């Protein structure tokens, strides 16, 4: 059963009437531009064809009722006229509550709603299931009440909800690509200005995501350490963020920095350049150059930012051995486990799947991957 049909059926069963609107917001994968977002840099994600779907309708009072189909049909209910606080034991509810609370702070002119939510964005894989949920809830309220909020505002609203209400530190990339994604395109995002440029993905190229199924330990503490090291490097150069440090400025005096801090800065500064070059390569259909840039990105994450782990490196090597210079592959996401992303001709998807299934468990003491074949998809809207 499709997510739309599932949410409609559950809505009618639990609320006793039919929904008036169905909204979707996608997950995402970042093709290149890792740990550049909080350095005011550039990223190149695309929305994927895994999404959160919400069946919804207005209410004629000030109550929000919400059902999570994927959490055994759990229900939450709260009033728009009372302070919105965290749910005592349903963590999923806090994403909904946070989005609604921050929408109120932006524009209080909306009433109650009934919502039924379901999604197929893999959780815990670094594919932004939480951003997909936040954008979907915001889009649902915007559509029901014709709120004067564009995609950027809905993305910022979701980020604020996650940072301030849920309590998870995140950049703007995940929400922005979920809100603004375009079919068959990646989106070059300037994380300082929030300006975007659509970049076409060649039609014969598949976006493949492979989850290493390595449990991501240390990710929060190491993430915070990397941020602090980047901020230290920016202070050394007297700039707001590493975005403002060019390679010409950095390389002649990198030896004056603490060696570890210099490595972290070298990754960010070179990754920004790679991301801009990758947007041009992808738009031109130059998969050989795109593959080279993705390979350099992975090496930089491994050696300078030090956020890959051996099973991830093995996975990248296995995929690279099959696709050669006909595509690209690298780790994607925060690091210390999670997923790799690969761009490859459709004809190579099954050979890659077979090679990974054969080699990955042998090289990693029995780990088994999860394989997703995706298409660059459109951002949030009705479905």
Curated annotation (Swiss-Prot):
One of its GO terms (cellular component) is cytosol. Mg(2+) binds at residues 130, 162. The record marks 28 as: Transition state stabilizer. Keywords: ATP-binding, Carbohydrate metabolism, Cytoplasm, Galactose metabolism, Kinase, Magnesium, Metal-binding, Nucleotide-binding, Transferase. It catalyses: alpha-D-galactose + ATP = alpha-D-galactose 1-phosphate + ADP + H(+). GO terms for molecular function: ATP binding; galactokinase activity; magnesium ion binding. Catalyzes the transfer of the gamma-phosphate of ATP to D-galactose to form alpha-D-galactose-1-phosphate (Gal-1-P). This is Galactokinase. It comes from Serratia proteamaculans (strain 568). The gene is galK.
């Amino acid at each position: 059963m499709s997510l739309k049909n599932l949410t409609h059926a559950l809505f009618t069963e639990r609320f006793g009437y039919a929904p008036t609107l169905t909204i979707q917001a996608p997950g995402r994968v970042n093709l290149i531009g890792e740990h550049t977002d909080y350095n005011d840099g550039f990223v190149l994600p695309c929305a994927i064809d895994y999404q959160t779907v919400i069946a919804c309708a207005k209410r004629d009072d000030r109550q929000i009722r919400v059902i999570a189909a994927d959490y055994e049909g759990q229900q939450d209910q709260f009033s728009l006229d009372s302070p919105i606080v965290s749910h005592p034991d349903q963590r999923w509810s806090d994403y909904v509550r946070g989005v609604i609370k921050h929408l109120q702070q932006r524009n209080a002119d909306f009433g109650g709603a009934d919502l039924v939510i379901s999604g197929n964005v893999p959780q815990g894989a670094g594919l932004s299931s939480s951003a997909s949920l936040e954008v979907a809830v915001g889009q649902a309220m915007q559509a029901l009440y014709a709120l004067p909020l564009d995609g950027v505002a809905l993305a910022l609203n979701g980020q604020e909800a996650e940072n301030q209400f849920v309590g998870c530190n995140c950049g703007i990339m995940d929400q922005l690509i979920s809100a603004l994604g375009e079919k068959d395109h990646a989106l070059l995002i300037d994380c300082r200005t929030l300006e975007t440029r659509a970049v076409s993905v060649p039609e014969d190229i598949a976006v493949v995501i492979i989850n290493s199924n390595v449990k991501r330990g240390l990710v929060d503490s190491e993430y915070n350490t990397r941020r602090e090291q980047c901020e230290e490097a920016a202070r050394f150069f007297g700039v707001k963020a590493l975005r403002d440090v060019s390679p010409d400025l950095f390389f002649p005096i990198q030896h004056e920095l603490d060696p570890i801090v210099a490595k972290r800065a070298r990754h960010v500064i070179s990754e920004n350049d790679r991301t801009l070059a990758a947007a041009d390569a992808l738009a031109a259909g130059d998969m050989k150059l795109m593959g080279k840039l993705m390979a350099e990105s992975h090496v930089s994450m491994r050696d300078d930012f030090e956020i890959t782990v051996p099973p991830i490196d093995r996975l990248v090597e296995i995929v690279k051995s099959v696709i050669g210079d006909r595509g690209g592959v690298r780790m994607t996401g925060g690091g210390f486990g999670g997923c790799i992303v690969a761009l490859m001709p459709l004809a190579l998807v099954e050979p890659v799947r077979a090679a990974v299934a054969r080699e990955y468990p042998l090289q990693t003491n029995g780990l088994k991957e999860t394989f997703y074949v995706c298409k660059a998809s459109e951002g949030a809207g009705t479905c």
